Amino acid sequence: MLKKIILSFFIGFVVVVLALGVVFFNLKSNSVYYAQHTPHKAEMEPVLMEVTRNLDWIYSPDIKGIKYDYDGYRNIYNKKYGKDEAASFAYYFREEWSYDDGNFFLYKFDKRFRLISVWNVKTLEFTSKPVDVSAVKRDIYRVVQPVIDAQSEPLINLQWIYDWVNKDRFN
């Protein structure tokens, strides 16, 4: 009798752990799809945030001109944009993002995706000129759009769980 109870609890525990693992994997690997459909503040960019934050989980297609860097920071390089070098978009583990436009400017964003600073690589100083943030965000989308377009719809849609987990992050 005692063996049956212990075995039942053990099997139940294993089933719960496996179910949580499947949900976690689904949320991570389909985070870009879920971010496209999640409610968020106007200035937030959940798609841009998730495409690099979960770069090692999402589908990274082999597209000519696009390179991925998983060592250290998570970067997406697009050689089609930028005059001197490839434009890149990166995620730092302290919840910051950076965009290198390939034209001597490095834009830094905080965890709410607000512009923190603009670094001029040519003069090695921060620029104080006003920046059109919406134009910078359009440029970032242009750089990572092929990766975003390659993401498929999840087999099991857990949008409601994704929205519940990230409600404070994007609002």
Q: Residue locations for each model-derived region?
A:
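N-terminal export/targeting and maturation segments
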Residues: 18-101
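N-terminal Sec-pathway targeting helices
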Residues: 1-18
